């Protein structure tokens, strides 16, 4: 292990004594594969003298890991603060194929390559999805504790200082270009002690600390609606595990969630069974039981090896940026409705934000300001806002009742729907449609919704 003592720079200081060093793993040889950033030579902000720009990334999930790596590669003195190095988040763990390539992820951190999905309606009608996938295409299934640790390690290899600590609060700058003072509790993983209070001064902060973000609270970023996700990891027999070898299941219905879905996703040697809800959080365990019952025959005899719960944001925060502080990932609210996807968008937003800082600071040589970080938000909104709006509409239309969910599952049987859905999901690009097929899809959608509404009216009559 290599012991690295943080240096004291003019205008910035760390309150801990010089001999209170931070221990990091030795960096491995690193192959630089990231694309070059275009640096504007007309920057008018002051140069940073005698040191490089200092940035703290709070939170070590996909957003924080991707941000810290990009910053460190770009010449920024980077500090990544993560409170729990083995954190297991209740996350389905699905990642799109494009993320594997964009973030150079090794295949050995992917537990399963899902090529088949079953969408199961409230009446247990199952539709097989994945017929249009090409031989090389798949949805990757990962464990968050594995993915997150890998991205943090890569950030450390790029030069970031990874600190095991709990972020407490942040003192705002007292003058233009003055530092932010971060207060955190530093932990020693060897002693498992109560921790030591420390401070760190930095020029900018990236808040990647999740749905309960303390960085967001520090800049009064505002609240948002959130879902509660509940997940159990269940160890099942080898013969039952073969069924889920490359298959994931999604269950819809009022029994598993009034506004989301239940899932069974395969991991390395177990399955993750979970559900979520925004409107009925107190009933989450009831919905989880219903999800298990729906999948009962396929997971019977399984042993629960871990139980996890966590909030999931439902829309972006009212404020995602203030001065030299920006929010990314769940802290910013970047989780899609309808699907609940967040891993890719977290990592992508972390990278985008870091790129804006690297570019604005001219590889760490100049101070950044809010206009530099705002470029990240402008690029993000232009690229992904339409995706969020479309999925928001889909959730409102198809998740509002059991008849609507039946119509949704019926639509999923259409190969054109599957192709458009998978192409958009796997590559995060709006797939070009066929005008004739689009017209057929519109007619079929209307027909499905008409049948769903007729069914709902009949069910309402029977309930009177």
UniProtKB/Swiss-Prot annotation:
Keywords: Chlorophyll biosynthesis, Chloroplast, NADP, Oxidoreductase, Photosynthesis, Plastid, Transit peptide. One of its GO terms (cellular component) is chloroplast. InterPro entries: BchP_ChlP_pln/prok (IPR010253), FAD-bd (IPR002938), FAD/NAD-bd_sf (IPR036188), Geranylgeranyl_Rdtase_fam (IPR011777), Geranylgeranyl_Rdtase_pln/cyn (IPR011774), Geranylgeranyl_reductase (IPR050407). It holds the Pfam family FAD_binding_3. It comes from the Eukaryota. Transmembrane segments: none annotated. This is Geranylgeranyl diphosphate reductase, chloroplastic. The lineage of its organism: Eukaryota, Viridiplantae, Streptophyta, Embryophyta, Tracheophyta.
């Amino acid at each position: 292990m290599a012991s690295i003592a943080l240096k004291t720079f003019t205008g910035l200081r760390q309150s801990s004594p010089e001999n209170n060093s931070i221990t990091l793993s030795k960096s491995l040889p690193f192959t630089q594969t990231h694309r070059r950033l275009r640096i504007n030579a007309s920057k008018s902000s002051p140069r940073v003298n005698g040191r490089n720009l200092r940035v703290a990334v709070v939170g070590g999930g996909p957003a924080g890991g991707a941000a810290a790596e990009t910053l460190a590669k770009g010449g920024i003195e980077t500090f990544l603060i993560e409170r729990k190095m083995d954190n297991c988040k209740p996350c389905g763990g699905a990642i799109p194929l494009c993320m594997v390539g964009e973030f150079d992820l090794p295949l050995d951190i992917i537990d399963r390559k899902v090529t088949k999905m079953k969408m199961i309606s409230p009446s247990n009608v199952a539709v097989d999805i994945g017929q249009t996938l090409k031989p090389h295409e798949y949805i990757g299934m990962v464990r968050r504790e594995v993915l997150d640790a890998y991205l943090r390690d890569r950030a450390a290899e790029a030069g970031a200082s990874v600190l095991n600590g709990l972020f407490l609060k942040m003192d705002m700058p007292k003058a233009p270009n003055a530092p932010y003072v971060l207060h955190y509790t530093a932990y020693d993983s060897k002693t498992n002690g109560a921790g030591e209070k420390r401070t760190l001064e930095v020029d900018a902060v990236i808040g990647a600390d999740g749905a309960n973000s303390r960085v967001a609270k520090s800049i009064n970023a505002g609240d948002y609606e959130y879902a509660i996700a509940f997940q159990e990891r269940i160890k099942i027999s080898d013969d039952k595990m073969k069924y889920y070898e490359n298959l994931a299941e999604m269950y819809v219905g009022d029994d598993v969630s009034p506004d989301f879905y239940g899932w069974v996703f395969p991991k390395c040697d177990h399955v993750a069974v979970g559900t979520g809800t925004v409107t009925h959080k107190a009933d989450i365990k009831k919905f989880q039981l219903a999800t298990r019952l729906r999948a009962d025959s396929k997971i019977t005899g399984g042993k629960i090896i871990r139980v996890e719960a966590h909030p999931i944001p439902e829309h972006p925060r009212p404020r995602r940026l203030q001065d030299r502080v920006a929010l990314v990932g769940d802290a910013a609210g970047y989780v899609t409705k309808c699907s609940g996807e967040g891993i890719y968008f977290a990592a992508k937003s972390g990278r985008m934000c870091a790129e804006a800082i690297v570019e604005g600071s001219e590889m760490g040589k100049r101070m950044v300001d809010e206009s530099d970080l705002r470029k990240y938000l402008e690029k993000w909104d232009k690229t992904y806002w339409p995706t969020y709006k479309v999925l928001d509409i889909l959730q409102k239309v198809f998740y509002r009742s059991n008849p609507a969910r039946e119509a949704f599952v019926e639509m999923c049987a259409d190969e054109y729907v599957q192709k458009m859905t998978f192409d958009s999901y796997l590559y995060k690009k709006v797939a070009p449609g066929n005008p004739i097929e689009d017209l057929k899809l519109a007619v079929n959608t209307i027909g499905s919704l008409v049948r769903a509404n007729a069914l709902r009216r009949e069910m309402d009559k029977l309930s009177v």
